[in-house]
Amino acid sequence: HSIGEFWRRWHITLGTWMKDYVFYPFSLSKAMNKLGKFFKKHSKTRFGKYMAKALPICLADLLIFFIVGVWHGAAWKYIVYGMYNGIIMSFSSIMAPVYEKMFKITHINKNARWYRGWQIIRTFILVNISWYFDNAATLTDAFRLMGNTFKHASFSMDAVVKMFGSQLDLIILLAGCLVWLIISILKEKGIVIREALDRKPLIIRWAVYIALVMSVAMLGYISNTSGGFMYAQF
């Protein structure tokens, strides 16, 4: 539903390391503590007092995503990729009180399906914009790709299949996305998949186990023939 939630789920190991060794040490440092006290002392408004707490967190987010950008590669496109995400997260933290006030004025129900759907669409768009910087050859190419998205927009199924390698690769990808979507919906509803599977008949459980083993074997073969581990260079 947000860039922050996306990153918490996207790269859990990297996120945990950054949280333990960068975020907490930086945001709780003496310098950030002094900065927070300075804002709290000289701010007379409620928003100013909120900034005393939010600013160290925002600066820590910017530092983390700068490091994440450099971790992806020593190039400007990766630095912009990291800072893009960091700025969005920091801006969201700063504007949180303003958003809450807007919700009260407009009487928007944040738990309504339409609003949650809007959050998903918004996050999907923001994340896909960041991929321009991650996937382009250079920073200049990233901005050129953005412009061409709107200037030369077209759709070709043959081009989509070619991008993923083969029709089989595309089918496997779509099947995986469908399974992922179903699992995500079940988790959002509070259903523990393992517990639900344990309540099923033995034949269904074994069918699922065999399907999982075959999927791992098949995907492992595909991975070995498609260029290896994508993070091997980092």
Language-model regions, residue ranges each:
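Non-catalytic, membrane-anchoring transmembrane segments at the edges
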Residues: 5-233
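Cytosol/matrix-facing ends of alpha-helical transmembrane segments
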Residues: 1-2
